[in-house]
């Protein structure tokens, strides 16, 4: 994880400079820029991917900034009207450097090694619409196009888990009757249609099954689905390499490995808005654990969370990691009984920011430098305000 995002004067963002890690948490009130940050990150990761697969050339976006970079690319997440005259955006990874400034957009290709392609999923806060609608929605009038993408993946996930899926809380099980196109939620002694279930279940189910579904696809290492055009191009490039008598076997192998990396997903980038939506704190904790388990499925997976809730914390998973790594066999066993290693978070792989409306730089890290966990003092401002008003 070596991606960096610098943004100035864009929508609600005044000035940020963020280096992303394996787990990234953005906490703050409405309108502080949490979603804006992760939408930009999603946009640039997708742009990297489309350039690597040569679906589009760099010139396609750099020569027509307003129509293609702003309206087409940024418009996917409905952030195309966030630009100002003094907007500056920089995104940099091992593979590309993207810079927007003065209504120009530049793309610089770097010499980083391609190890595969990311499977990127943006999980919107509006996901409850999918559960309450039940029938597959073909249009999302008034909502970003990203909702339509998530809708399609949600239905693929339902087919994958139609024989049953256990939610991470409440002893609840999900079943999908594909013949009649009906989703069911089963408790210990009851069964209701998903459209009649609680808002918490309607919000949580799409997150759970889509995350599990895509995480399993990436972890399996299978080739990703390709269009006929992509497949033909890959076959043509493979034949060209194999038929070139001027290349040594070692060079051919290296070039073929490079081509192969374009046909496989090596990581799942899971971007989830408000995982705590309509959930009780204990259920929020179970949801976070599931997302972290999926994120730990492969080394290069990434998890980005936006949240309003101080309950959406990762400290227990960090502390469990630290105790497990330092402990003897007996300590490891006791820690694993409380928090199994599949949920653990390495503090070196975590970043967390609090965003506010005030100040030129309206963000700050809430990680303690000494402990590596999220500082309670930075997140307890609401409690202090309530107590001050009460007193």
Per-segment meaning from a language model:
Residues 286-291:
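Conserved hydrophobic alpha-helix in the ABC-type ATPase nucleotide-binding domain
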Residues 280-281:
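Conserved D-loop-proximal element of ABC-family nucleotide-binding domains
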Residues 266-267, 299-304:
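Loop/turn-to-beta-strand initiation segments
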Residues 306-308:
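H-loop/switch region of ABC-family ATPase nucleotide-binding domains
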Residues 92, 97, 121, 126-265:
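Extended helical coiled-coil dimerization/tether regions that scaffold
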Residues 273-275:
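Walker B catalytic acidic pair
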Residues 269-271:
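Walker B motif beta-strand of ABC-family P-loop ATPases
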Residues 1-178, 258-259, 297-300, 312-313, ...:
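P-loop NTPase switch/coupling surface
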């Amino acid at each position: 994880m070596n991606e960096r995002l610098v943004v100035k004067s864009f929508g609600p963002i005044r000035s940020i400079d963020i280096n992303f890690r394996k787990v990234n948490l953005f906490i703050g009130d409405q309108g502080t820029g949490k979603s804006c940050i992760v939408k930009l990150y999603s946009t640039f990761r997708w742009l990297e991917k489309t350039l690597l697969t040569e679906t589009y050339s760099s010139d396609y976006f750099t020569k027509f900034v307003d129509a293609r970079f702003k309206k087409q690319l940024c418009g996917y997440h409905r952030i195309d009207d966030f630009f100002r005259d003094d907007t500056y955006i920089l995104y940099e990874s091992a593979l590309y450097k993207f810079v927007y400034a003065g209504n120009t957009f530049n793309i610089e290709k770097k010499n980083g090694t391609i190890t595969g392609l990311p499977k990127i999923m943006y999980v919107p806060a509006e996901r409850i619409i999918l559960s309450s609608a039940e029938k597959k929605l073909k249009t999302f009038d008034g909502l970003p196009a990203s909702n339509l993408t998530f809708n399609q993946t949600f239905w693929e996930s339902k087919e994958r888990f139609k024989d049953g899926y256990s939610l991470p809380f409440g002893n609840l099980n999900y079943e999908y009757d594909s013949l009649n196109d009906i989703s069911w939620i089963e408790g210990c002694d009851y069964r209701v249609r998903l459209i009649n279930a609680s808002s918490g279940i309607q919000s949580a189910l799409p997150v759970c099954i889509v995350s599990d579904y895509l995480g399993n696809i990436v972890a399996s290492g299978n080739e990703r689905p390709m269009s006929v055009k992509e497949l033909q191009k890959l076959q043509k490039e493979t034949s060209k390499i194999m038929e070139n008598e001027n290349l040594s076997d070692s060079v051919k192998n290296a070039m073929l490995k490079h081509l192969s990396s374009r046909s496989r997903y090596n990581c799942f980038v899971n971007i989830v808005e408000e995982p705590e939506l309509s959930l009780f704190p204990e259920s929020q904790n179970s949801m976070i654990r599931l997302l972290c388990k999926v994120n730990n499925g492969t080394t290069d997976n990434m998890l980005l969370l936006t949240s309003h809730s101080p309950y959406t914390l990762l400290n227990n998973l960090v502390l469990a990691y630290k105790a497990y790594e330092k402990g003897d066999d007996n300590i490891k066993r006791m820690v694993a009984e409380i928090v199994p290693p599949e949920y653990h978070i390495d503090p070196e792989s975590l970043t967390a920011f609090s965003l506010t409306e005030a100040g030129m730089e309206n963000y700050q890290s809430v990680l303690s430098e000494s402990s590596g966990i999220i500082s309670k003092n930075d997140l307890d401002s609401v409690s202090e305000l309530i107590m001050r008003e009460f007193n």
